[in-house]
């Protein structure tokens, strides 16, 4: 297994699919990375040479991925909560942020039903 950005990449899968194991890299960005390094999308990671893997590592390093991206996302949510704006308040109360209805549904975000105390 090759390690790119601190993630073990499976050897037996195509390069495009394998790169998506890195947090912050989806299919589109994975295709762009393969095109920039000249790696065929259908090439298996296990069959690539160390030089090509180093090129892939360098190309991935240009993007914000893994721990840095997770930190960036959590800090932006924390910033919204500190501001006290509507989105921050919704995050703080564990409610849907983007205008979905909450009279019914939203069970994933709100958690299991709580019984009404009498």
Swiss-Prot record:
This is Small ribosomal subunit protein uS13. Keywords: Ribonucleoprotein, Ribosomal protein, RNA-binding, rRNA-binding, tRNA-binding. Pfam families: Ribosomal_S13. InterPro entries: Rbsml_uS13_C, Ribosomal_uS13, Ribosomal_uS13-like_H2TH, Ribosomal_uS13_bac-type, Ribosomal_uS13_CS. GO terms for cellular component: cytosol; small ribosomal subunit. PANTHER family: 30S RIBOSOMAL PROTEIN S13/40S RIBOSOMAL PROTEIN S18, SMALL RIBOSOMAL SUBUNIT PROTEIN US13M. Belongs to the universal ribosomal protein uS13 family. One of its GO terms (biological process) is translation. It comes from the Bacteria. The keyword Membrane does not apply. Residues 91-118 are annotated as: Disordered. The keyword Glycoprotein does not apply. Located at the top of the head of the 30S subunit, it contacts several helices of the 16S rRNA. In the 70S ribosome it contacts the 23S rRNA (bridge B1a) and protein L5 of the 50S subunit (bridge B1b), connecting the 2 subunits; these bridges are implicated in subunit movement. Contacts the tRNAs in the A and P-sites. One of its GO terms (molecular function) is tRNA binding. HAMAP family: Ribosomal_uS13. Part of the 30S ribosomal subunit. Forms a loose heterodimer with protein S19. Forms two bridges to the 50S subunit in the 70S ribosome. It comes from Marinomonas sp. (strain MWYL1).
């Amino acid at each position: 297994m090759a390690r790119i950005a601190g993630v073990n990449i499976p050897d037996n899968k195509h390069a495009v699919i394998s790169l998506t194991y890195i947090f912050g890299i989806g299919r589109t960005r994975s295709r762009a990375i393969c095109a920039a390094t000249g790696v065929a999308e259908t090439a298996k990671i296990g069959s690539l040479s160390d030089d090509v893997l180093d090129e892939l590592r360098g190309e991935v390093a240009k993007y914000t991925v893994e721990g840095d991206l997770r930190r960036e996302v959590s800090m932006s949510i924390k910033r919204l909560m500190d501001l006290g704006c509507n989105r921050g308040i919704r995050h703080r109360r564990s409610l849907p942020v983007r205008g979905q209805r909450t009279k019914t549904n939203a069970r994933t975000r709100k958690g299991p039903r709580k019984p009404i105390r009498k």
